[in-house]
Regions:
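Nucleotide/pyrophosphate-binding catalytic subdomain
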Residues: 1-95
């Protein structure tokens, strides 16, 4: 089994880039099996800005205060998860 990290930037791809979910579907059809771990950094950043919550980074990692963690959980288990599942289903992948 392969574990694939699908970053938030990959999910926010522009129209002229290949759909990462379509790439995964082709690998699945070729017999590869994998688990997807998703990120959501850009979506988290947007929600933090919307709520006027400051977020800082240290050595490339988000410093996650309790207030920031509440937003992170909300975004990752809400809109991002639903978007990933919907995108997987659209290309025929089980989710």
């Amino acid at each position: 089994m392969i574990v694939i990290k699908l970053g938030g930037h990959a999910m926010g791809q522009s129209q002229n880039q290949e759909n990462p979910f379509q790439l995964l579907a082709s690998r699945w059809e070729a017999g590869e099996r994998f688990a997807i771990i998703h990120g959501g950094g850009p979506m988290i950043d947007t929600e933090l800005q919307r709520k006027n919550i400051e977020s800082t980074f240290s050595n490339g990692y988000r410093v996650t205060t309790p207030q920031v963690m509440e937003v992170v959980e909300m975004v990752l288990t809400g809109s991002v998860l639903r978007s990933v599942v919907r995108s997987l289903n659209q290309v025929g992948l089980p989710a």
